Amino acid sequence: MIRIVVAGASGWVGRELVRAVAAAGDLSLVGAVARSAAGRDAGEVAGGPALGLAVSATLAEALAVPSDVVVDYTKPMW
């Protein structure tokens, strides 16, 4: 099982990624990051069923759980 964190989970692509990872049999969504959706359920933010995973406000919070891959779909700050 590959453990995935999605940064930018409340954006258009981030929501698609959350739904795709949640539906995949060989992937596990272990973190989702979106300041605007912090504390809400990642599945519900993505427009799907609840996943029992709260969205983190920062990447550091999400990385407190071991992960294998971080997919970053955040807006550049430069």
Predicted regions located by residue number:
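Beta-loop-alpha module in the N-terminal Rossmann-like domain of NAD(P)-dependent dehydrogenases
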Residues: 59-61, 65-78
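Surface-exposed acidic, glycine/proline-enriched linker/cap segments
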Residues: 49-53
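Conserved protein kinase catalytic core
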Residues: 14, 37-40, 78
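NAD(P)-binding Rossmann-fold cofactor-contacting core
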Residues: 23-48
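N-terminal Rossmann NAD(P)H-binding glycine-rich loop of SDR-like oxidoreductase domains
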Residues: 6-10, 14-19
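Extreme N-terminal starter segment of soluble prokaryotic enzymes
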Residues: 1-5
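Short acidic-hydrophobic, aromatic-tinged amphipathic segments that line or gate anion-handling sites
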Residues: 54-58
